[in-house]
Amino acid sequence: MSANGWFQILLFLGLILAVTKPLGVFMARVFNRERTFLDPVLRPIERLIYRCTAVDESQEMKWTEYAIAMLLFSAVSMLMLYIMQRVQLHLPFNPQKFGAVDPAHLAFNTAASFTTNTNWQAYSGEAVMSYFTQMAGLAYHNFMSAAVGIAIAIAFIRGIARRQSETIGNFWVDMTRAVLWVLLPFCIMGALALVSQGVVQNLKPYDTVKLVEPQQVTTTGADGKSSTQTITTQTIAQGPVASQEIIKEWGTNGGGFFNANSSHPYENPTPLSNLIEMFSIFAISAGLTYTLGRMTGSQRHGWAVWGAMAALFLVGVSVVYWAEASGNPLLAGVDQHTSAMQAGGNMEGKEVRFGIANTALFATITTDASCGAINGWHDSFTPLGGMVPLVNIMLSEVIFGGVGAGMYGMLIYIVLAVFIAGLMVGRTPEYLGKKIEAYDVKMAMLVALIFPLIILVFSAISSVKTFGTGSILNPGPHGLSEILYAFVSGTGNNGSAFGGLTVNTPWYDVAIGIAMLGGRFLMIIPMLAIAGNLAKKKYVPASAGTFPVTTPLFSVLLIGTIIIIGALTFFPALSLGPILEHLQMHAGKAF
């Protein structure tokens, strides 16, 4: 570890702190239908969209209507993406003449992935997807799935803020305003910033260039005979990368235009582009904590939530940085000390232009949020370094979290935290003037149980059946970690992976696809039910026995609730995976 590395980590957190209030105020004004500086340009576009789609922007919805609208929109969007992949060969902007995405289970997996904001990729983007599919299919879903998440979070906040109301907003209006005001303007500026750093943006066919030094490759055929081939050229992929890269991060989507994701120099060429991408992942989620405080009338509560998130983030990034900077004890003959000429530590799977500090920071950010973008290979981290991204997702990605998803996930933990506080003082728990009753706790626990149930059931099946174990590259505890990470990432709508697992198989494509859909929609519905129930309730003035939700004590209780419910649920599985691998690594055994 180095002072420069810590400075970069603290600089990043300082930037997020600086943007929290202005962005939070802006989003509160947008969703409260207050005037903003963008209204003269965007209001006419918004009204035109409503006229074309026959949406009455003054008509609000009950939580059930809100949920149905969200489910129908997502289902139609997913079907459209599936069809687009299957007829890709006949669509424009396909200079490489890529055929239909095949087999069908891969197209299903990809459609489920981008619809749910997961962006899990069981394919190599530059070898499978045409420019049209990337732009009209995947990038479109990057915008819309992020907008759905923001809409759900805003609906939940309205449920807390409103009194004796049957409605929580209009899904179509919330989603439209999320796209027009929150996502598009910032993505336009961000894409231009990335282009200035060297991220490509074109519709050119792939380039073929001659290698400076020809390479010889020896392969073994099915008959057992080996043959040597001399490679003299290389194909360099092109494409509209910058426009997709920025919404990939700003919308916490994570799916890369290229298979190497944000470690590819065409996606993330410089340290400055790396900072822009990391900042984009956390910005909206941090701002939503201030939006929560502003819309509910308790700004200090918003900061208390921000503080809990920041504390968990700092612990996570510190552990990853320490684990990776410490290096691998099995490589005693390799110089792993930090110096002016090298980053030191475990550099396997990391880009030298970023080093260990920025790779550890990026990995923590992308798994704290439901993003899944990577600038280094998580599978090549040390056991403890790789465990932190895994645990971050297991906590339901509430450490700032995905756009919208992090906020409504955190609100579930808040409901459970104030319920626990109420039990300790022997009175009905209250949250910002609303009594938390049995129905609310049941729905919150339903969310808390669905997540680990999906993960552990699918992981258990994959660990004992040959169609699951046959995809493992590394045996032993690391193989279990690869399986566990796949289903944690899918169910948590993250999308990152331990790349040693071969996932483009019928079992993993279908199982992870189902996990992604369940992790998104089976959790959103109970959340909306809580929002609808809270909106109906009367305001109860705070009394001497009310547990304050604006203090450091509340932040500590919230952190404890997250760790107990989130992390301890998976502790047995972690003990058999990364923890066991760490102990065996220090005993001299590798996998």
From Swiss-Prot:
Any one GO molecular function term: potassium ion binding
This protein's record includes keyword Cell membrane: yes
Top-level taxonomic group: Bacteria
Entry GO terms, CC: plasma membrane
Transmembrane segments: 6-26, 63-83, 137-157, 179-199, 272-292, 303-323, 405-425, 444-464, 510-530, 553-573
Disulfide bonds: none
Pfam families: KdpA (PF03814)
NCBIfam families attached to this UniProt entry: kdpA (TIGR00680)
Job of this protein: Part of the high-affinity ATP-driven potassium transport (or Kdp) system, which catalyzes the hydrolysis of ATP coupled with the electrogenic transport of potassium into the cytoplasm. This subunit binds the periplasmic potassium ions and delivers the ions to the membrane domain of KdpB through an intramembrane tunnel.
Family that this chain belongs to: Belongs to the KdpA family.
Subunit relationships: The system is composed of three essential subunits: KdpA, KdpB and KdpC.
Name of the molecule in the record: Potassium-transporting ATPase potassium-binding subunit
Organism listed in the record: Koribacter versatilis (strain Ellin345)
